[in-house]
């Protein structure tokens, strides 16, 4: 009994795709670092809390920072947002109640007790905001700071800025302008990734 030609072609394509997928880094990747936190509302959001997860594929480089600085100098907040949109994802932010979104910029800085992680990405604009052309659409960044204490995990803290934009203050310094108040991050759990990568 002979096998029809189209079945041979399908079988060969299947084998080739399987081999190609096995060699892709996405299928044979190292373990990512994951940081879970509980975000507590402050000010007008007092009493509310949500879960926040930051998955770190890799950290951004000083060259990435320079690209963002130049983009801000040329186009202010809109320039920064456009530059973030063009950058590849270095992580993923998940906030309870959302599907989550790719994170374009994550930097790590050593501290006396551990590490400081700063992240920023474009905020997803909701359908209601777009429909009503809300003022909140100009706050198109989500950012955060995580202060990880490796000596005493209970002292790890941070801040989440769910809707923000960068502006220059009266002294010409960059500052974060928020739509509402920052959220306080606590109960941070750091699930270390593959050593040396993230």
Predicted regions and their residues:
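Long, low-hydrophobicity ectodomains and other hydrophilic envelope-associated domains
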Residues: 30-198
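Bacterial N-terminal signal peptides
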Residues: 10-22
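Sec/Tat signal peptide C-region and signal peptidase I cleavage site
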Residues: 24-28
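N-terminal secretory signal peptides that target proteins for export/translocation
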Residues: 1-7
């Amino acid at each position: 009994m002979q096998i029809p030609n189209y079945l041979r072609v399908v079988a060969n394509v299947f084998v080739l795709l399987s081999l190609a997928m096995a060699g892709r880094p996405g299928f044979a990747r190292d373990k990512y670092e994951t940081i879970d936190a509980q975000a507590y509302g402050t000010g007008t959001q007092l009493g509310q809390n949500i879960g926040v997860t930051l998955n770190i594929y890799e950290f951004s480089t000083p060259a990435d920072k320079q690209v963002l600085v130049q983009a801000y100098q040329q186009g202010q907040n809109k320039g920064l947002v456009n530059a973030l949109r063009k950058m590849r994802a270095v992580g993923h932010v998940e906030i309870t109640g959302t599907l989550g979104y790719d994170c374009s910029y994550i930097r790590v800085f050593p501290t006396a007790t551990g590490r400081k992680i700063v992240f920023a990405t474009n905020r997803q604009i909701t359908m209601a905001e777009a429909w009503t052309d809300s003022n909140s659409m100009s706050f198109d960044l989500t950012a955060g700071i995580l202060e990880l204490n490796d000596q005493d995990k209970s002292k790890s803290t941070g801040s989440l800025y769910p809707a923000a934009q960068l502006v220059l203050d009266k002294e010409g310094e960059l500052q974060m302008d928020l739509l509402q108040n920052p959220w306080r991050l606590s109960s941070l759990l750091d699930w270390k990734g593959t050593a040396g990568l993230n």
